[in-house]
Swiss-Prot record:
Monomer. SUPFAM superfamilies: Metallo-hydrolase/oxidoreductase. GO terms for biological process: methylglyoxal catabolic process to D-lactate via S-lactoyl-glutathione. Gene3D superfamilies: Ribonuclease Z/Hydroxyacylglutathione hydrolase-like. It comes from Marinomonas sp. (strain MWYL1). Belongs to the metallo-beta-lactamase superfamily. Glyoxalase II family. Zn(2+) 1 binds at residues 54, 56, 109, 129. The lineage of its organism: Bacteria, Pseudomonadati, Pseudomonadota, Gammaproteobacteria, Oceanospirillales. The keyword DNA-binding does not apply. This is Hydroxyacylglutathione hydrolase.
């Protein structure tokens, strides 16, 4: 199984899953139909499945048109009745080619947000807008408590898990992360690497969970020095509880320029 991105809009990635023994592909969050259809036409592939992480248009906008070209199953949040043929929720399992993906509910960015995890030789997490390289999704519908719970869930996955977020936000995320931890050597090194990748117009994703634990402020909101910096940016006293500390980091990011 291989996974690679098709760029869409300004900074979206439609992740394509393919298997060497199949002419079919799966598309993750196809916000634009023509991107997927053009790929299928050019490489003589057939769309055999769609995974949706949440309802936002840049993740679902191409699904209806793709369904007109393919009778493939569409897995996603159960309330998307016009798009989803196979509604799923936390703990459900989906067979993608020969690999099993387990659904992990991660409300926060949206209330319906789902991630898809496959525990294989190299574990895979399709994280949608919940976790990015160096960042997490803006809290649009959920609560800070819910998003922290999602971060804790993801932190419990194997350290070698490859994380496929759906936006190329890394350099902007790192600018904020470095404002909190300017002396974090892992963060500095990763930022240099990612700047080079973007100069070459290459994606900075996927990332590895072990790297995120060392560099991503939303997986590090328990670190004392980071908490202090986030609170200072908000002109607040550092929170003493985990939810409050995470909230300060998220709100500091929201107002960061």
């Amino acid at each position: 199984m291989t996974i690679f991105p098709l760029p869409a809009f300004n900074d979206n990635y439609i992740w394509i899953i393919q298997d060497k023994d199949s002419s079919g592909i799966w598309a993750v969050d196809p916000g634009k139909a023509d991107v997927v259809l053009n790929f299928c036409h050019e490489y003589q592939k057939t769309l055999t499945g769609i995974l949706i992480t949440h309802h936002h248009k840049d993740h679902t906008g191409g699904v209806a048109e793709l369904k007109q070209h393919s009778n493939c199953p569409v897995y996603g949040p159960e309330h998307l009745t016009e798009l989803v043929t196979h509604p799923v929720d936390d703990g459900d399992r989906i067979l993608v080619f020969s690999k099993v993906f387990t659904v992990i509910a991660t409300p926060g960015h949206t209330l319906d947000h789902l991630c898809y995890f496959s525990e294989q030789e190299t574990p895979i997490l399709l994280s949608g807008d919940t976790l990015f390289k160096g960042g997490c999704g803006r809290i649009m519908e959920g609560t800070h408590e819910q998003m922290l719970a999602a971060m804790i869930k993801i932190s419990g996955l194997p350290n070698d898990t490859l994380i496929y977020g759906t936006h190329e936000y890394t350099l902007a995320n790192y600018r904020f992360a470095l404002s909190l931890e300017p002396n974090n050597k892992d963060l500095i090194e990763s930022n240099i690497t990612c700047q080079k990748l973007r100069t070459e117009e290459k994606p900075t994703l996927p990332t590895k969970l072990s790297i995120e634990k060392k560099t991503n402020p939303f997986l590090r909101s328990h670190i004392e020095a980071l908490k202090i910096q986030a609170a200072q940016q908000l002109n607040e006293i550092p929170a003493e509880n985990p939810i409050g500390a995470f909230s300060q980091v998220r709100r500091a990011k929201d107002s960061f320029s």
